[in-house]
Amino acid sequence: MKKVLNKYSRRLTEDKSQGASQAMLYGTEMNDADMHKPQIGIGSVWYEGNTCNMHLNQLAQFVKDSVEKENLKGMRFNTIGVSDGISMGTDGMSYSLQSRDLIADSIETVMSAHWYDGLVSIPGCDKNMPGCMMALGRLNRPGFVIYGGTIQAGVMRGKPIDIVTAFQSYGACLSGQITEQERQETIKKACPGAGACGGMYTANTMACAIEALGMSLPFSSSTSATSVEKVQECDKAGETIKNLLELDIKPRDIMTRKAFENAMVLITVMGGSTNAVLHLLAMASSVDVDLSIDDFQEIANKTPVLADFKPSGKYVMANLHAIGGTPAVMKMLLKAGMLHGDCLTVTGKTLAENLENVADLPEDNTIIHKLDNPIKKTGHLQILKGNVAPEGSVAKITGKEGEIFEGVANVFDSEEEMVAAVETGKVKKGDVIVIRYEGPKGGPGMPEMLKPTSLIMGAGLGQDVALITDGRFSGGSHGFIVGHITPEAYEGGMIALLENGDKITIDAINNVINVDLSDQEIAQRKSKWRASKQKASRGTLKKYIKTVSSASTGCVTDLD
């Protein structure tokens, strides 16, 4: 008996009582033969106003062509996106993290309302990646991700530059390290075309995680946006989704606990973004896999940082692809017993089978260090707890900034206040900069602090100050930084009670973050604290404040 591949779409196309549905489909130029084909949603996060996303419509057409060669019916649709790079440092960043959940909601909505049988999702930027994955997990219909791809490095006066060079140019100009003319040249040459930010920032981090999970094709995460290889990846979409339909392989068959462990190992080795903690927690929630921030610490305790990527290192993703790409790194880790090779992937094969014929990394490469010569012996993503963060926080400690910082609190109730303080010389060596009321509810939207960290680095204070916040950090942030502090200030967490001059210790060796205050003093301050007014009174941000969970549970919006 022939297997039914259109088991969802036939609800509309073959049921005589759905005449109006069929009339509208005929009106889209479908014919009689099309009515019996499996319908594949092709969900692109295309929009013109961002280098990460500007080319995705073209990729979606390549995917549609590939799907239809396999006697399937491709149905393209778009969802929204927010460019962190464009909105960074403004109130627009409040909309960034919540766009992840809106993307998941909208893809789930279109796929469910229109009864599509499978999904090929095409994200390009930071929050696009987990948003598409959360939708795949919720729907649990055959599907996979095609990453829009990474950007090529910019070049200025013979030297490679990227988006973080542009962010740091303002601080460098303020401190006299570069001229205004050099700043202008930097921002005009940092982004040479389509593709996601080139270092191990959030988009590339999540692309690596998705490939390690088995939810994208091999090499997807390291192939550049404008390469022939990215077109070839799109050309494989039809046979890939048809195979998934025929074998009835669904996301929950692939996104298992062991697969998430593979993802956590790879992003640790790669030196990935702190945002991966939030996003992997949210992705795991979408498939009912029990994952917690403590699991990240367990992985960090036994996994080294090997990749020398920007922002703290030298290289970008295009450099890695030139020497073998992400699969070559995974093959090295598999040989070392650090990955679960028996995990199923969207090829229909196991991870180990996918990697069997992948070439090894060159012995003399300088991008990926050998296991016996790591950049850092343990993971850079450290989960810190203590009286400042009883429910946890996430530190990004590469080792270059040290592992212990003791200093005095310099407290700001917004990102803007802190930026003004740096500009006027009110941030000094030895400060623990505290930026609060920037959490999921308080921000709202838990905005990223790339502007403050870039300003600190550009001003030459990167080795001399620490920054803690209930907000997030961009994948482009580096320095001695601790984010995701929970409970957040808006909910009366300890970060709301800190005052200028408080002595704070950040210890990434023992995983603690404490303020030197007695329980009596803390209780006294707590009794005086009053909740602040919601920053959003209408619309999507108000709904987000009411539904979002804490950073330690992934900032998801569909928990009970």
UniProtKB/Swiss-Prot annotation:
GO terms for molecular function: 2 iron, 2 sulfur cluster binding; dihydroxy-acid dehydratase activity; magnesium ion binding. The keyword Iron-sulfur applies. Its EC number is 4.2.1.9. Mg(2+) binds at residues 84, 126-127, 448. The modification N6-carboxylysine is found at residue 127. [2Fe-2S] cluster binds at residues 52, 125, 197. It catalyses: (2R)-2,3-dihydroxy-3-methylbutanoate = 3-methyl-2-oxobutanoate + H2O; (2R,3R)-2,3-dihydroxy-3-methylpentanoate = (S)-3-methyl-2-oxopentanoate + H2O. Functions in the biosynthesis of branched-chain amino acids. Catalyzes the dehydration of (2R,3R)-2,3-dihydroxy-3-methylpentanoate (2,3-dihydroxy-3-methylvalerate) into 2-oxo-3-methylpentanoate (2-oxo-3-methylvalerate) and of (2R)-2,3-dihydroxy-3-methylbutanoate (2,3-dihydroxyisovalerate) into 2-oxo-3-methylbutanoate (2-oxoisovalerate), the penultimate precursor to L-isoleucine and L-valine, respectively. This is Dihydroxy-acid dehydratase. It comes from Francisella tularensis subsp. tularensis (strain WY96-3418). The lineage of its organism: Bacteria, Pseudomonadati, Pseudomonadota, Gammaproteobacteria, Thiotrichales. The gene is ilvD.
